[in-house]
């Protein structure tokens, strides 16, 4: 409810609201009605899990058919760092409906040295081609909900 949101915003420096879910999959392409960004939203974070890389889109991407169409690849194409960066940076993908808001990418599940190297590849593409800043994160097993 609007009143509760306004109360939270007076109590906190930052309020994080999930604008759309990915059905527990590490990446997604938004549907026509997504994301649902509130007018008070001033920053958008596109989040993707690195566990998606090197797997077919159909196995790791929520709405794989939309992602495949957006990326001009078949649904059985393996998700590469380049494809993930393109999906996250696309105004039909991770940047959909962002407009003039601040936009950043968060790469989660950076749990191994190999995934850290892949995350650097994605981050380099986002920075060099799209001028998008990127952060990485991971949780230890005991920290996961």
Question: What do the PLM-derived regions correspond to, one by one?
Answer:
Residues 1-11, 20-129:
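Conserved catalytic-core segment of NTP-binding enzymes
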Residues 13-15:
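Ligand-binding beta-strand-loop-alpha-helix segment within the catalytic cores
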Residues 132-143:
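A generic structural motif
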